[in-house]
Amino acid sequence: MWSHLNRLLFWSIFSSVTCRKAVLDCEAMKTNEFPSPCLDSKTKVVMKGQNVSMFCSHKNKSLQITYSLFRRKTHLGTQDGKGEPAIFNLSITEAHESGPYKCKAQVTSCSKYSRDFSFTIVDPVTSPVLNIMVIQTETDRHITLHCLSVNGSLPINYTFFENHVAISPAISKYDREPAEFNLTKKNPGEEEEYRCEAKNRLPNYATYSHPVTMPSTGGDSCPFCLKLLLPGLLLLLVVIILILAFWVLPKYKTRKAMRNNVPRDRGDTAMEVGIYANILEKQAKEESVPEVGSRPCVSTAQDEAKHSQELQYATPVFQEVAPREQEACDSYKSGYVYSELNF
């Protein structure tokens, strides 16, 4: 019985000493050999759906440390390591997955937490649109470039390029408005290609606009004459239509009305075109008197104003009569026969 009591007393004393030693060792490790771990990532700016890697490391390379990763109070994983950081691979798909994250390093009964780490979720920029305005002079070309990306988290940095060479510094825009860049160049002999780049805080992610090619002027020629010719022709056509509608047509209608109001005189018609029909001519013998039946004829005549007129004609009847006595005259010649004309 005494031996059993001695064993219990021995184990109680041993356990007490061990616990005190562990507490003393943990306190010593906390102050000297076991500082707080460090949680980091290669990038702090991500977009939704991006895979990321988080590194939890400790300055003490000689201890076997157990690393645990937490997002708020949710445990995400545990790894053991000695001298090397623990790597946790994650996928950021929702806004609440941006953080904060913490890493816990534990050795036996001693544990410490890292500082909070959070990601910044950024929407990527879409391909920008490049617009060019040109003012052409005899010797110079004044060019204004506008670049705008309609989607993407602000701020957005724009850079302009000419033939794949940057010609402007990064222009930051904190509002959804286009970046503008002006330049003046001598009339070139070759074609020039322009484009712009848009990027925000998302690293290693940039989009470019479609290239816009400016044709060469070829000396004093105008590269935009063809583009301006079509609007000019359309404007000229509109002007002609307006002139016809408001000036020529009313004038034509007035002249036509005046012509219709002029009185028509059939007797004084300058030109008369008639179509005659049913004219019968009969000749009798030399001894008999020719006699032709009277038949009315109808003709149609048109005056200058194109108005049709209906005219009636009759066939004359010839009768032989006795010759009358004529006074003698040197110039008179006999042998003529006169007839009466009856209608």
UniProtKB/Swiss-Prot annotation:
One GO BP annotation of this record: mast cell degranulation
Annotated Ig-like C2-type domain residues: 35-118, 128-213
Residues linked to a glycan: N51, N60, N89, N151, N157, N182
Ranges in a coiled coil: none
InterPro entries reported for this sequence: Ig-like_dom_sf (IPR036179), Ig-like_fold (IPR013783), IL-40-like_Ig (IPR040878)
Keywords (A to Z) from UniProt: Cell membrane, Disulfide bond, Glycoprotein, Immunoglobulin domain, Membrane, Phosphoprotein, Repeat, Signal, Transmembrane, Transmembrane helix
Subcellular compartments: Cell membrane
Protein's UniProt keywords contain Flavoprotein: no
Oxidoreductase found in the keyword field: no
Record-listed Phosphotyrosine modification sites: Y313, Y338
Record PTM text: N-glycosylated.
GO molecular function, one term: transmembrane signaling receptor activity
Extracellular-side positions: 20-227
Intrachain S-S bonds: C56-C103, C147-C196
Membrane topology term: Single-pass type I membrane protein
Binding partners and assembly: Monomer. Interacts (tyrosine-phosphorylated) with PTPN6, PTPN11 and INPP5D.
Designated name of the protein: Allergin-1
Organism field: Homo sapiens
Gene name of the record: MILR1
